[in-house]
């Protein structure tokens, strides 16, 4: 695909995304205003409630699907779920904890939040998170298989350890401050992505419209397969102008560029 074709493709994608967000936002705001006027919701009546104090059975997997609620993951002595919203429900399916909010949380006028506490010594088999308009913050995540599907809100993860990692970012910013991430498949949307962590195994990153900053350990650990787009690609202070292989490390990262810049730096 030529540079001109790439430009047309990404401009069309960006225009489509902006138009879609504008239409959806207008519809949601309009419906929300009607419902709030009809039900006259009083946010002060909502108090934090523990929807499950403890889970007697072993929880190996957690599946979270939130349309508009914020998600906060914290360290705790046991698996615990809290929410300030009546729209948030949970159930246990075998060894899987499932958490979901209803679509009405988009229009009920509340700032809905879910807090999930996970012991620091617990490594989950699977963690699936699908989040829409809300933000996500996590102190620590330790999991074999991670699947993140993010929407308009920002995401910050202080420490991430994962063996198999699939992340789709949306319009919000995405930040990982530390950790060890293996076999990463990352698709970046519109927002800015910053990852400060080791990335191990065979990984693939598609920047699309958003920008990417990687802060990695020693450069000798990595091989980069660069498919340059319209944005700049800078690896260890050297700008890459063409598609090429950079480095000869054991860990491979395929970088597919788009409109946004890609900047890779290393610990000195």
Predicted regions and their residues:
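N-terminal Lys/Arg-rich, disordered targeting/topogenic segments
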Residues: 1-7
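Acidic/proline-rich low-complexity IDRs
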Residues: 6, 16-20, 33, 37, ...
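Hydrophobic membrane-insertion alpha-helices, especially the h-region
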Residues: 10-29
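Short linear S-[DN]-x-LW-Φ motif typified by the pepsin-like aspartic protease active-site region
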Residues: 29-102, 107-130, 135-141, 145, ...
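A short hydrophobic/aromatic micro-motif that marks alpha-helical segments and, especially, helix-coil
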Residues: 83-84, 148, 167, 186
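Extracellular repeat turn/loop positions enriched in glycine and acidic/polar residues, especially those
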Residues: 121, 130, 149, 168, ...
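Short, surface-exposed interaction patches in beta-rich subdomains
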Residues: 158-160, 164-169, 173-268
């Amino acid at each position: 695909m030529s540079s001109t074709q790439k430009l047309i493709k990404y401009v069309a994608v960006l225009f489509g995304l902006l138009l879609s967000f504008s239409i959806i936002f207008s519809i949601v705001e309009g419906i929300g205003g009607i419902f709030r006027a009809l039900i006259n919701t009083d946010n002060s009546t909502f108090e934090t409630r523990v929807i499950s104090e403890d889970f007697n059975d072993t929880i190996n997997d957690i599946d979270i699907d939130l349309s508009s609620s914020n998600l906060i993951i914290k360290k705790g002595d046991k698996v615990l779920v809290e929410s300030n919203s009546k729209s948030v429900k949970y159930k246990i399916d075998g060894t899987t904890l499932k958490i979901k909010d209803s679509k009405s949380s988009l229009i009920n006028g509340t700032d809905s939040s879910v807090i999930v506490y996970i012991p620091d010594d617990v490594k989950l088999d699977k963690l699936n998170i699908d989040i829409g308009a809300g933000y996500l913050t996590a102190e620590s995540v330790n999991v074999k298989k991670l699947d993140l599907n993010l929407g308009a809100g920002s995401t910050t993860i202080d420490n991430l350890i994962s063996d198999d990692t699939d992340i789709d970012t949306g319009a919000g910013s995405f930040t990982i401050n530390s950790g060890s991430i293996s076999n990463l498949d990352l698709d970046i949307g519109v927002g800015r992505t910053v990852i400060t962590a080791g990335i191990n195994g065979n990984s693939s990153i598609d920047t699309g419209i958003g920008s990417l900053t990687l802060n990695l350990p020693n450069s000798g650990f990595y091989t980069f397969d660069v498919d340059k787009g319209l944005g700049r690609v800078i690896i260890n202070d050297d700008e890459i102008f063409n598609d090429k292989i950079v480095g000869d490390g054991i860990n491979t990262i395929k970088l597919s560029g788009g409109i946004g810049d890609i900047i890779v730096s290393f610990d000195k």
